[in-house]
Amino acid sequence: MTVLFILSAGLVAVFGYLVSWFIYCRTLHPLSKVPGPFWPSVTRLWLTYAVSRGELDVVQRDLHRRYGPLVRIAPDEIACADPEAIRKIYSTTSPLNKSDFYHIWDVGAFSKYPNAFAIVDENMHFERRRIVSSVYSMSTVLTLEPYIDNCSRLFVKRMTERTVPHEAIDLGDWFLWYAYDVIGELFFGHSLGFIENRGDEGGFLASLEVMLPVLTIAAASSPLVRGLIMGLFTLSSTARKGLKGMNHIIETARASVDKRASAVAEPGKGERKDLLHNLLNIVSSKGDKLDFGIEDVKNEAFAALTAGADATMIELQAIFYYLVKDRSVYEELRKEVDQAVETGKLSEFPSYSEVVQLPLLKATIKEALRLHPAVGFTMPRVVGQAGIELLGMYIPPGWKVGMNAAVVGRDEGVYGTDANTFRPERWIERTDSDMDRCNNLVFGAGTRTCIGKQIALSEIYKMVPLLIRKFDFALVDPSKSWTTHDYFFNKQSGVQVKVTVRGL
């Protein structure tokens, strides 16, 4: 009887707590007036589940269609789809701190400082980023074009050798190999060998594929259960494979930087002027003053290895997917590229300064990035002490707000009623600052714009016309669509194409 009474009392207490919590979240909570479904307003498990399915971009677009530009996606978090809010949430003058979503991404453990992506405090981020910002500027990236071209030449050579008219290839694989080999050229003084070997022989890339969904699900979860999620994951054989691969990546970054630092210290050596050289230059010239040492360079190298290639791969794949789906745009772009080559305006391996003069090329790249940004996630920020007003609604300090480029990029008020359609001409027909501002969200916005943005854009702009000129791409089955997997990076699969050499 006593046991039964205790169990009954416990159930009543739990039920009473849940009812009280539900009433509070729905009626008294500072975010209770923000529209949205019931479950996100009372538990973060709804968001965790949505993330675990790998389709948060699709879910959020549907939520905003149903509930409007402000939607509550967790008891303490709002997703905003109002283009005007970009300036407020991702301000360059009064930036908001990142939320605890980013804590879990501080992996690598080289420096006493987190990697730039995982730093949540804006003051610390400002101090650390300004140390290396010049290294990643477009003016510096343009000096690195010969190293990017090394990978492009090998890409064309290996694809030409491999291509059989009726043999399909996975474009995503090839673009990922290319992007990682460029990272190798820029950070480690040599290609990582993916294009040369036409594969992931060491399981390097596979380990990242294993880790990304788990880290993303844990990051989106309540801090109270993140440890549990990661703990359960580490018990699996899949986890051991992923962690082994991650340790290999850590050691690759460590060994490569140490080897290069030793070479630079020797007279007559270290003449290769790549990105790693520029970072080591900071260490030798003002490292003590800036508290920036070899371990911080390893942080940069590790960040490049774990996140520096995905955006390039995703966007290159998106561009060619939309082109082979819409042959009319493909043919027009090929005419533009061919004409530029024939009139001497475009080199065989184009420079960035040449390709940005091609209007349809620029429009095509912008349009593909708009429709399928590399990151399909809300980038949450914590409202500061002054609070913030969004669409006439005051959001008090301490709550989380964010925007998803995969939602904002399809805003019909900005891009028109055909916002879900691939139509590059929209970028040529009119000049609109709102269009560019929304599209800039693809690489983040404000003070937290992706530091590798210029590297990615340089690779993309140079590679697209090169491949358009050298090859012809066609979908194996034009009736099929790709499959996307939105675990922070919104990766695609199933883009099988036939490739033929044009012979020009």
Swiss-Prot record:
Broad EC category: oxidoreductase
Cofactor: heme
SUPFAM superfamilies membership: Cytochrome P450
Record pathway: Secondary metabolite biosynthesis; terpenoid biosynthesis
Domain of life of the source: Eukaryota
A GO term, aspect molecular function: heme binding
Iron among keywords: yes
PROSITE patterns in alphabetical order: CYTOCHROME_P450 (PS00086)
Disrupted gene: phenotype observed: Impairs the production of griseofulvin, but accumulates the intermediates griseophenone C, monochlorinated griseophenone G and dichlorinated griseophenone G.
Alphabetically ordered keywords of this record: Glycoprotein, Heme, Iron, Metal-binding, Monooxygenase, Oxidoreductase, Signal
Coiled coil: none
Protein biosynthesis among keywords: no
Binding residues for heme: 450
Any one GO BP annotation for this protein: griseofulvin biosynthetic process
Reaction(s) the record says it catalyses: griseophenone B + reduced [NADPH--hemoprotein reductase] + O2 + H(+) = desmethyl-dehydrogriseofulvin + oxidized [NADPH--hemoprotein reductase] + 2 H2O
Record's description of how this protein is used: Griseofulvin is a spirocyclic fungal natural product used in treatment of fungal dermatophytes.
Annotated family: Belongs to the cytochrome P450 family.
Functional note: Cytochrome P450 monooxygenase; part of the gene cluster that mediates the biosynthesis of griseofulvin, an important antifungal drug that has been in use for a long time for treating dermatophyte infections. The first step of the pathway is the formation of the heptaketide backbone by gsfA which is initiated by priming with acetyl-CoA, followed by sequential condensations of 6 malonyl-CoA units. The resulting benzophenone can undergo a spontaneous dehydration to form norlichexanthone.
Protein's name according to its UniProt entry: Cytochrome P450 monooxygenase gsfF
Lineage: Eukaryota, Fungi, Dikarya, Ascomycota, Pezizomycotina
